[in-house]
Amino acid sequence: MRTYNRSLPARAGLTDLGKVTTHTKGPTPMVGLDSVSGQYWDQHAPLAD
């Protein structure tokens, strides 16, 4: 379990999640925005590693 967004401010995390998720998984921007806890990245984002 990685806390990727822990190193980023909450607002910056939201922005990054929205942009990156939109580019990588177009139909799921809300999922990334909703999972600010980082669980989404831990399971679905290789770049978090």
From Swiss-Prot:
Crosslinked residue numbers (Isoaspartyl glycine isopeptide (Gly-Asp)): 26-34
Main localisation: cytoplasm
Thermal dependence of catalysis: Highly thermostable.
Outcome reported for the amino acid change (mutating residue 35 to A): Decrease in cleavage by the isopeptidase AtxE2
Entry GO CC: cytoplasm; extracellular region
Propiece residues: 1-25
One BP term from GO: defense response to bacterium
Post-translational events: This lasso peptide is hydrolyzed to a linear form by the isopeptidase AtxE2, in vitro. The isopeptidase AtxE2 only recognizes the threaded form (but not the unthreaded form).
Keywords: Antibiotic, Antimicrobial, Cytoplasm, Isopeptide bond, Secreted
Compartment list: Cytoplasm; Secreted
Keyword Hydrolase listed: no
Domains: entry comment: Is composed of a ring composed by 9 residues, a 5 residue-loop (SVSGQ) and a C-terminal tail. The peptide is threaded when the C-terminal tail is inserted throught the isopeptide-bonded ring. The loop region serves as a recognition element for the isopeptidase AtxE2.
Function of the protein: Shows weak antimicrobial activity against its phylogenetic relative Caulobacter crescentus. Does not show activity against other bacteria tested (E.coli, Vibrio sp, Burkhoderia thailandensis, and Salmonella newport).
Protein's name according to its UniProt entry: Astexin-3
Biological classification of the source: Bacteria, Pseudomonadati, Pseudomonadota, Alphaproteobacteria, Caulobacterales
The encoding gene: AtxA3
